[in-house]
């Protein structure tokens, strides 16, 4: 099946690729096209904005967390259901974080997916030098196909004409797909890894309309929408499971402004393993969904909603009761904090009381505590699988756990690029909590193991 689409990249962060990606998504959607949005890397923030611009959930594509076969499979699965796929890059096009120079880079994703690259170049103060920069990117990696360029921060119509002449003369094989004029009012507030979330700072319809108008006026939208994906073979896809034909098992998944950081493929893989996902709000709901046999608490920013979470005592009681009954409960980062006794400031003064399943408090810090990719090895059996399994994910937080008791099982050995960071993945009964956001695509046993644990609990409860 043929797929139209492209990857929007840049030489470096701050070039305007997110704003331009949103403008293209909004404009193509307004033209009646179904847009499938994607984001390179582990970021949860830009996908929230993608959803607002495109009307569809954005999918993370990460070549470090997930095998290439999984990346190719999930891209094809989501892109085939749309008219055009728009992939937003992360950092500079060739900037990776893995052991090899390009692993984890947007260039790797472009190569895996066979996506042509559209390079967004900040042309402020440049003319012929801009073409030289584009030429370097076009020739750097033969596995990456640079199909077009968009110049951003163009100072005037004359500047745009000069850039067009230079490109036509020096690089006629690379399409000039538009010149975006300088407009500081179009910038999105600082949002890197969540300083501002899409839920906290939703894009107003009039802002999206302005972006769509900008794209209509200054970009070759037909040329962009006509770019074709060239599928490449990257090995066998990961095997899937549908739960062995058994009836679905209900799993409650927290989803609101406080708990909005989740990889969409985690939810898909849980469904494919036989999970029936029921969403609930720890902020607004007074009870858990009926008939559930498991709970998934994703990450987010509970510290921004601490008081509202703390006063929702019926929900806290329901979470405590589920844990007491032995229901499988998996929590990541913000979800983990929600399961502690509560939060305190950097001086130890209490801020809010939470579920108290783990006998410890989370302390907020003035500076970032952790950021980066993580690999975990399971030291013991848990609701995510047997001992010896490995998985990959990402960690980002401004809090720390204050002296977790030694009798609480540490399920994970955590490393960063091979360097040992410590043991966590705290386990009490059937509750597993960690600061690491695991991508279930990194290991095909994770989602089926969690669903199997929920199914086992359901069977025990029936008996």
UniProtKB/Swiss-Prot annotation:
GO terms for biological process: cobalamin biosynthetic process. The keyword Flavoprotein does not apply. InterPro entries: CbiA/CobB_synth, Class_I_gatase-like, CobQ/CobB/MinD/ParA_Nub-bd_dom, GATase_3, P-loop_NTPase. It holds the Pfam family GATase_3. The record marks 437 as: Increases nucleophilicity of active site Cys. Residues 250-445 form the GATase cobBQ-type domain. Its EC number is 6.3.5.11. It catalyses: cob(II)yrinate + 2 L-glutamine + 2 ATP + 2 H2O = cob(II)yrinate a,c diamide + 2 L-glutamate + 2 ADP + 2 phosphate + 2 H(+). GO terms for molecular function: ATP binding; cobyrinic acid a,c-diamide synthase activity. Keywords: ATP-binding, Cobalamin biosynthesis, Glutamine amidotransferase, Ligase, Magnesium, Nucleotide-binding. The active site is at residue 333. Pathway: Cofactor biosynthesis; adenosylcobalamin biosynthesis; cob(II)yrinate a,c-diamide from sirohydrochlorin (anaerobic route): step 10/10. Its cofactor is Mg(2+). The keyword ATP-binding applies. Catalyzes the ATP-dependent amidation of the two carboxylate groups at positions a and c of cobyrinate, using either L-glutamine or ammonia as the nitrogen source. PANTHER family: COBYRINATE A,C-DIAMIDE SYNTHASE (PTHR43873:SF1). Comprises of two domains. The C-terminal domain contains the binding site for glutamine and catalyzes the hydrolysis of this substrate to glutamate and ammonia. The N-terminal domain is anticipated to bind ATP and cobyrinate and catalyzes the ultimate synthesis of the diamide product. The ammonia produced via the glutaminase domain is probably translocated to the adjacent domain via a molecular tunnel, where it reacts with an activated intermediate. The a and c carboxylates of cobyrinate are activated for nucleophilic attack via formation of a phosphorylated intermediate by ATP. CbiA catalyzes first the amidation of the c-carboxylate, and then that of the a-carboxylate. Belongs to the CobB/CbiA family. This is Cobyrinate a,c-diamide synthase.
């Amino acid at each position: 099946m043929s797929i139209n689409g492209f990857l929007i990249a840049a030489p470096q962060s701050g070039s305007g690729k997110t704003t331009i990606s949103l403008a293209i998504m909004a404009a193509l959607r307004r033209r009646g096209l179904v847009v499938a949005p994607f984001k390179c890397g582990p970021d949860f923030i830009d996908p929230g904005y993608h959803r607002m611009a495109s009307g569809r959930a954005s999918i993370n594509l990460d070549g470090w967390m997930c095998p290439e076969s999984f990346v190719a499979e999930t891209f094809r699965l989501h892109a085939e259901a749309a008219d055009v796929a728009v992939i937003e890059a992360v950092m500079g096009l060739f900037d990776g974080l893995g052991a090899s120079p390009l692993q984890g880079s947007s260039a790797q994703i472009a190569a895996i997916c066979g996506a042509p690259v559209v390079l967004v170049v900040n042309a402020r103060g440049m003319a012929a030098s801009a073409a030289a920069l584009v030429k370097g990117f076009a020739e750097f990696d033969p596995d990456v196909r640079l199909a077009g360029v968009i110049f951003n921060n163009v100072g005037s119509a004359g500047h745009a004409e000069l850039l067009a002449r230079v490109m036509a003369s020096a690089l006629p094989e690379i399409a000039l797909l538009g010149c975006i004029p300088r407009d500081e009012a179009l910038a999105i507030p600082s949002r890197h890894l969540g300083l501002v979330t899409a839920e906290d700072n939703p894009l107003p319809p009039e802002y999206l309309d302005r972006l769509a108008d900008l794209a209509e006026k200054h970009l070759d939208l037909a040329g962009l929408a006509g770019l074709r994906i060239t599928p490449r073979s990257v090995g066998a896809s990961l095997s899937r499971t549908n739960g062995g034909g058994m009836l679905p098992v209900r799993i409650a998944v927290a989803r609101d402004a406080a708990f909005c950081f989740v990889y969409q493929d985690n939810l898909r893989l849980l469904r494919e393993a036989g999970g029936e996902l029921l969403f609930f709000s720890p902020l607004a709901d007074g009870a858990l969904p009926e008939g559930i046999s498991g709970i998934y608490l994703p990450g987010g920013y509970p510290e921004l909603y601490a008081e509202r979470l703390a006063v929702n005592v019926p929900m806290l009681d329901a979470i405590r009761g589920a844990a007491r009954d032995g229901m499988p409960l998996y929590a990541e980062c913000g979800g983990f904090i929600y399961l502690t006794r509560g939060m305190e400031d950097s001086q130890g003064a209490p801020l809010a009381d939470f579920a108290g399943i783990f006998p410890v408090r989370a302390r907020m810090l003035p500076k970032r505590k952790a950021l980066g990719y993580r690999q975990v090895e399971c030291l013991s059996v848990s609701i995510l699988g047997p001992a010896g399994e490995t998985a990959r994910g990402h960690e980002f937080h401004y809090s720390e756990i204050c002296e977790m008791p030694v009798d609480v099982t540490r399920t994970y050995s955590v490393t960063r690029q091979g360097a040992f960071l410590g043991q966590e993945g705290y386990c009490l009964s059937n509750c597993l909590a960690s600061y690491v956001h695991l991508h279930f695509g990194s290991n095909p046993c994770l989602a089926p193991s969690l669903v199997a644990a929920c199914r086992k609990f359901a069977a025990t409860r029936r008996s």
